[in-house]
């Protein structure tokens, strides 16, 4: 059962080619993209065979269906290359996290701020979390002040996507990078 499912997942809908085209008449497009016109399927197959290429159904929804004379293997290869190139150029946005404490000293604050700036410049989102321990929960306003300071310091690099909210003993805020022009 699993093996069958695995094969189904790989199977991609392929365009009907040559004898697999069921229409009687087709609108034929030549090798160089020129319109040949509406011809019978037998005539279209003969023209494709003379050119030693395949007859590929491009648009099955049209009446009559649109078919093109091309090298189908080369067409699949080009399509695969385009998909790979598009995938390669796509950047996966990650969420990077920096953790603060209510008593974070100035030196540590500057280091963490520098890292946040780097994350935002790289195009990643930044999650700023502030953890309270023990009796620090009584002074949540200190945490809010710290997150406001982070927000102000990062104003030129990013915008707040999720404003500070308390979840258990943690205050969290998400900052997204500004769109580049």
From Swiss-Prot:
- Keyword set includes Protein biosynthesis: yes
Q: Classify the source by domain of life.
A: Bacteria
Query: Where does this polypeptide localize?
Result: Cytoplasm
The alphabetical list of record keywords is: Cytoplasm, Initiation factor, Protein biosynthesis
What processes does the entry annotate via GO biological process terms? ribosome disassembly
Entry GO terms, CC: cytosol; membrane
> Main site of residence?
cytoplasm
Q: What is the annotated role of this protein in its UniProt record? A: IF-3 binds to the 30S ribosomal subunit and shifts the equilibrium between 70S ribosomes and their 50S and 30S subunits in favor of the free subunits, thus enhancing the availability of 30S subunits on which protein synthesis initiation begins.
Q: Write the protein's name.
A: Translation initiation factor IF-3
Species of origin: Azotobacter vinelandii
